[in-house]
């Protein structure tokens, strides 16, 4: 009991002293009060002093008037303070550059772009950290070779801003919006910052709607959602580039929309090949007809520093957002490869000294990817539908990078080498490709039942292939023989001549309407075309062309 009385008296003594001190300090400057460490040593020791000060400072803090929340609280805004201020480089570590400013008024906010002065080439830095002592840590958007301490750096007072609008169609830009196709500057009056908020919830379109591509296998079995995100899986040489170009062409013709291709960590050779193929196929037009081009390209090549590769996806998305929001377009955004986006952010995170997370990835993996993916959506004005090529490291689907990406996808389109070896193009695997849109509540009973019927026939054929390889077709039952015959016709009917491949194949491209597509495959499942040969189903558009081709083959064989 005696010890309790002593402790109680000590607390009262400390409280009275702290209260008197607090009132004195508070009368001079009430803002100096905080529930932090004691202003002076308490006679009863550090712990009792902290307890006493906390008990006395809390009422003072609660009495202070609470500031009203800002009108746009939670919304990302940019304080353009410090524009024109000059800092100096004080440290260079690879792609990370530290810059010191003279005073706090010239200090740039996070995500502000800075430009190095008196440098042989334009070098832009993006502010990432405030280190204290008026020093900011930045990420370089280009190589830092030749950069030395003491070099002047200009605060632009704005984030990285890139040109947008129709002037970008048919052009190739880098992460900063600078043209890299040697065709002169991009003349436009419209510019937007690459760091922007996702559309507000009230601006989003709530309905689910198919984006018709005119490609039979996609529209029937793995339809794309308007404003959705599609993962494109495929190795080299299976027709990924041709499929991308056909999607660009068909969306432009059917919906009047534009496309944006963002090469993230792209091989320079592949980027150049894509550009040349787009010119040959008419997706991009040069000279006086440039305004008729259907696609803008934004490249951050594999040899670029990690800062550029981490931001080039945002640059491409910003160009697409302008077409959606300002022009009300249905835009296709291609990102090749979304894994390289994650990889580049991981490199930047390591350079900034963050502690790595699982498998060495950055601790902000989910938020980095989410900031990009949440901006890809449908609004009441227009839509951005994204097709993202995905590299899976060591074919491990549980790797954090692809696993985080899968959570955002609405559909997957898998290109199969086995199907391409059969000469069936597009080589989309009808059994591995999936879509959230494949539901009777969204597509309707007719479309859903036809799609599931086609998949059932193809799956049964796949199960019978081992028996056929060992025993031959003669050992199958009549029902199984009919299943095999229909499955082989369906396989070939899923092939389709592309508009962008006309210059290679000589066959005119075909755009197949969704309703015609469903009716054609339903007729196949019902056995209406069992008497037609397999060959007549290969590389045609609708079922009418199949019948016409079968008649032509019959006449040629009769002659």
From Swiss-Prot:
<dbReference type="InterPro" id="IPR020003">
    <property type="entry name" value="ATPase_a/bsu_AS"/>
</dbReference>
<dbReference type="GO" id="GO:0005524">
    <property type="term" value="F:ATP binding"/>
</dbReference>
<keyword id="KW-0496">Mitochondrion</keyword>
<keyword id="KW-0597">Phosphoprotein</keyword>
<dbReference type="InterPro" id="IPR024034">
    <property type="entry name" value="ATPase_F1/V1_b/a_C"/>
</dbReference>
<dbReference type="GO" id="GO:0045259">
    <property type="term" value="C:proton-transporting ATP synthase complex"/>
</dbReference>
<feature type="compositionally biased region" description="Low complexity">
    <location>
        <begin position="1"/>
        <end position="28"/>
    </location>
</feature>
<dbReference type="Pfam" id="PF22919">
    <property type="entry name" value="ATP-synt_VA_C"/>
</dbReference>
<keyword id="KW-0067">ATP-binding</keyword>
<dbReference type="GO" id="GO:0046933">
    <property type="term" value="F:proton-transporting ATP synthase activity, rotational mechanism"/>
</dbReference>
<protein>
    <recommendedName>
        <fullName>ATP synthase subunit beta-3, mitochondrial</fullName>
        <ecNumber>7.1.2.2</ecNumber>
    </recommendedName>
</protein>
<feature type="binding site">
    <location>
        <begin position="234"/>
        <end position="241"/>
    </location>
    <ligand>
        <name>ATP</name>
    </ligand>
</feature>
<dbReference type="InterPro" id="IPR004100">
    <property type="entry name" value="ATPase_F1/V1/A1_a/bsu_N"/>
</dbReference>
<dbReference type="InterPro" id="IPR003593">
    <property type="entry name" value="AAA+_ATPase"/>
</dbReference>
<dbReference type="GO" id="GO:0005743">
    <property type="term" value="C:mitochondrial inner membrane"/>
</dbReference>
<keyword id="KW-0139">CF(1)</keyword>
<dbReference type="InterPro" id="IPR042079">
    <property type="entry name" value="ATP_synt_F1_beta_sf"/>
</dbReference>
<dbReference type="InterPro" id="IPR027417">
    <property type="entry name" value="P-loop_NTPase"/>
</dbReference>
<dbReference type="InterPro" id="IPR020971">
    <property type="entry name" value="ATP_synth_F1_beta_su"/>
</dbReference>
<keyword id="KW-0813">Transport</keyword>
<comment type="subunit">
    <text>F-type ATPases have 2 components, CF(1) - the catalytic core - and CF(0) - the membrane proton channel. CF(1) has five subunits: alpha(3), beta(3), gamma(1), delta(1), epsilon(1). CF(0) has three main subunits: a, b and c.</text>
</comment>
<feature type="region of interest" description="Disordered">
    <location>
        <begin position="1"/>
        <end position="39"/>
    </location>
</feature>
<keyword id="KW-0375">Hydrogen ion transport</keyword>
<keyword id="KW-1278">Translocase</keyword>
<keyword id="KW-0809">Transit peptide</keyword>
<dbReference type="Pfam" id="PF00006">
    <property type="entry name" value="ATP-synt_ab"/>
</dbReference>
<dbReference type="GO" id="GO:0005886">
    <property type="term" value="C:plasma membrane"/>
</dbReference>
<dbReference type="InterPro" id="IPR005722">
    <property type="entry name" value="ATP_synth_F1_bsu"/>
</dbReference>
<dbReference type="GO" id="GO:0005739">
    <property type="term" value="C:mitochondrion"/>
</dbReference>
<dbReference type="InterPro" id="IPR000194">
    <property type="entry name" value="ATPase_F1/V1/A1_a/bsu_nucl-bd"/>
</dbReference>
<dbReference type="Pfam" id="PF11421">
    <property type="entry name" value="Synthase_beta"/>
</dbReference>
<dbReference type="InterPro" id="IPR055190">
    <property type="entry name" value="ATP-synt_VA_C"/>
</dbReference>
<keyword id="KW-0472">Membrane</keyword>
<keyword id="KW-0999">Mitochondrion inner membrane</keyword>
<dbReference type="InterPro" id="IPR050053">
    <property type="entry name" value="ATPase_alpha/beta_chains"/>
</dbReference>
<keyword id="KW-0547">Nucleotide-binding</keyword>
<comment type="function">
    <text>Mitochondrial membrane ATP synthase (F(1)F(0) ATP synthase or Complex V) produces ATP from ADP in the presence of a proton gradient across the membrane which is generated by electron transport complexes of the respiratory chain. F-type ATPases consist of two structural domains, F(1) - containing the extramembraneous catalytic core, and F(0) - containing the membrane proton channel, linked together by a central stalk and a peripheral stalk. During catalysis, ATP synthesis in the catalytic domain of F(1) is coupled via a rotary mechanism of the central stalk subunits to proton translocation.</text>
</comment>
<comment type="similarity">
    <text>Belongs to the ATPase alpha/beta chains family.</text>
</comment>
<dbReference type="InterPro" id="IPR036121">
    <property type="entry name" value="ATPase_F1/V1/A1_a/bsu_N_sf"/>
</dbReference>
<keyword id="KW-0066">ATP synthesis</keyword>
<dbReference type="GO" id="GO:0005507">
    <property type="term" value="F:copper ion binding"/>
</dbReference>
<feature type="transit peptide" description="Mitochondrion">
    <location>
        <begin position="1"/>
        <end position="54"/>
    </location>
</feature>
